[in-house]
């Protein structure tokens, strides 16, 4: 999935999980959403390997920075970095939760695309994938943007952000139904034409 959509999803999740009455030691809304935005974009920092070699990028992209095993380490490092950037105004603990959520939703967003994500790196290069969504999905992005706009208009409650996330989950669920139907059709086609298909796959397409 594109990095901007990842980042926006992190901001929406940060808003949806904001405490109703933040304590003085907790992040204010604007800061919290920016941290969610940045943290959700972080896993794609592996793009720097593109400057080493295109093949290296293809083989390592969605690797160690997208690993659920490494997520605690990346969360801690980001929390420390954010603490330094605000010059200790907030403890690193204030950043941990939203940073973890941001990285987590990025990983989830990549798992639902076809390229696959090495969620167990560096111990395994197996790529998890549940390919329901095209890598750039305007509808997916629009739902997130709609949730953020609604949250800014009705800023007294986190309900619009929660609803936005619920609609997003429902949309992916609908795509999953379509994906399963496509697999069923592919299997039926292979059987009817006496094709020895070892595996049938359905790859999502734009629109």
Where are these regions (language model features)?
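N-terminal membrane-targeting hydrophobic helices
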Residues: 1-184, 188-189, 193-204
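Acidic/histidine-rich
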Residues: 207
């Amino acid at each position: 999935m594109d990095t901007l959509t990842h980042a926006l999803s992190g901001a929406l999740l940060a808003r949806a999980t904001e405490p109703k009455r933040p304590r003085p030691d907790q992040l204010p809304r604007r800061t919290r959403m920016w941290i969610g935005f940045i943290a959700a974009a972080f896993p794609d920092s592996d793009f720097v390997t593109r400057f080493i070699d295109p093949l290296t990028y293809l083989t390592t992209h969605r690797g160690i920075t997208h690993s659920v095993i490494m997520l605690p380490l990346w969360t801690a490092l980001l929390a420390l970095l954010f603490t330094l950037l605000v010059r200790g105004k907030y403890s690193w603990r204030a950043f941990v939760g939203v940073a973890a959520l941001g990285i987590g939703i990025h990983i989830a967003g990549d798992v639902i695309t076809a390229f696959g994500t090495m969620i167990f790196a560096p111990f395994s290069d197996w790529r998890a994938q549940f390919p329901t969504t095209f890598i750039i999905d305007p509808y997916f992005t629009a739902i997130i943007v709609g949730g953020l706009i609604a949250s800014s208009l009705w800023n007294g409650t986190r309900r619009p952000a929660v609803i936005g996330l619920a609609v997003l989950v429902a949309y992916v669920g609908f795509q999953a139904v379509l994906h399963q139907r496509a697999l069923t059709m592919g299997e039926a086609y292979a059987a009817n034409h006496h094709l020895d298909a070892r595996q049938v796959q359905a790859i999502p397409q734009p629109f």
